[in-house]
Regions:
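Charged, alpha-helix-enriched surfaces in structured cytosolic catalytic cores
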Residues: 69, 73, 131, 226, ...
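Short conserved micro-motifs at the rims of enzyme active sites and ligand-binding pockets
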Residues: 181-183, 219-223, 272-273
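Short acidic (Asp/Glu) and glycine-rich catalytic loops that position anionic groups and cofactors
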Residues: 54-56, 207-212, 234-239
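Accessory alpha/beta interaction modules
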Residues: 1-206
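Short, charged alpha-helical interaction segments and adjacent helix-coil junctions
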Residues: 2-51, 120-125, 233-340
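Short hinge/gating elements
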Residues: 57-65, 155, 212-218, 242-246, ...
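Selected N-terminal structured segments and early membrane-anchoring regions
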Residues: 158-161, 167-168, 215, 260, ...
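Extended serine/threonine-enriched, polar tracts that run as long, contiguous segments within proteins
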Residues: 196-229
Length: 340
């Protein structure tokens, strides 16, 4: 496997060479030894080409898709996702009102302004949030409100609602929530608001959800046939055979891998970035487990509440039946007295 990728990327280093550098420098050795065996193997594998690089790690994604230095890459990706021509004008600060727990569950979150004034937010989640619809709707509304405040402050008295442009929330899931698995053959979900009467109004918010786990399952043993499939393969695959298939069929992706393998030449930097990814991954996992446990507790509390209500209703029914029996017993006693 190593030789196959090295044929395409000669800068890929040998395992012995990399380990020798790590052992010679106390700082690097300390970082390396702080990882468990699985993480050490993962690091060595992607640095030496045994596996491809995991593009979805935040540091790696931002290195290869940085809209400030190489905007054309993110532009090309957005063209495929939005299915329209895209030109990035500037990167916007992500000053949304997300709560801290939500921020910690994200891999990547980039907001850009497009040439027509619309906003696109690319959000990558390693583990899909619960309630993806409600969360997306709230964040989409927040994006729209932020744009409204910014434009109104800039335009002043000349402000017009016509100056408010579309906002696109693009959510890419490495592991998608259960709602998306109700559609096991679909890995592109697009939503915009419409009226059932046929009234045509642009409500400005559009949502796109891309479950990469479903894409990988769907593409198993299949050939990449479209640029969109090529992008999703780039984001989701670290299998060397898939990487080679991708760059042979779509050579425009090769420079992106070269960017990352060049980054791997700086061992100290890439080790520090990888360590930060691992820390974030651990936090993500803890947050996810807490959220799942809370959902289970809420569900159990709801069941207990329903059972209590049912028992209360049964107690009331028994009490009413007891009253009826007492009343019938009195009536029978009265009848006996009349007969006697």
């Amino acid at each position: 496997m190593t030789n196959k990728l090295k044929n395409y990327f000669p800068m890929i280093r040998q395992k012995d060479e990399l380990l020798e550098e790590i052992k010679k420098q106390p700082k690097l050795r300390a970082i390396y030894e702080s990882w468990d065996l699985e993480r050490r193997e993962e690091f060595l594998n992607f640095c030496t080409g045994v596996r491809g690089i995991k593009i979805l790690y935040d540091s790696f994604f931002k290195e290869v898709m940085n809209p400030e230095y190489v905007p054309e890459r993110l532009e090309n990706f957005l063209c495929e996702v939005l299915r329209r021509k895209v030109k990035i004008v500037r990167i916007l600060p992500n000053d949304s009102t997300r709560i801290a727990d939500e921020v910690s569950l994200l891999i990547t979150d980039i907001v850009v302004e497009l040439e027509d004034g619309s906003l696109a937010n690319v959000e990558i989640q390693k583990i899909g949030y619960s309630f993806p619809g409600a969360r997306s709707a709230c964040y989409g509304a927040d994006m729209l409100l932020r744009q409204y405040k910014r434009v109104r402050a800039k335009q002043g008295e000349s402000f017009s609602y016509n100056d408010i442009k579309n906002v696109f929330l693009i959510v890419i899931y490495e592991k998608s929530p259960k709602e998306l698995h109700q559609f096991p053959d679909i890995y592109y979900h697009h939503s915009r608001q419409t009226f059932d009467s046929g009234l045509k109004l642009d409500m400005l918010q559009e949502f796109i959800m891309i479950p990469l786990d479903i894409f990988r399952s769907k593409m198993h043993n299949k050939t990449i046939k479209t640029v969109f499939e090529a992008w999703l393969t780039f984001l989701s695959e670290d299998d060397p055979e898939k990487v080679i298939q991708l760059i042979e069929r779509y050579p425009e992706f090769k420079p992106m891998y070269e960017t990352l393998y060049q980054m791997c030449q700086n061992t100290e930097r890439v080790m520090e970035l990888f360590s930060e990814e691992l820390r974030q991954l651990d936090r993500n996992t803890v947050k996810y487990m807490i959220e799942q446990q809370q959902q289970e507790l809420d569900k159990q509390a709801e069941i207990i509440g329903q059972q209590k209500q049912e028992l209360s209703q049964k107690d009331e029914q028994l009490s009413q039946m007891e009253e009826r029996l007492k009343k019938q017993a009195k009536e029978m006693e009265e009848l006996r007295r009349q007969l006697g």
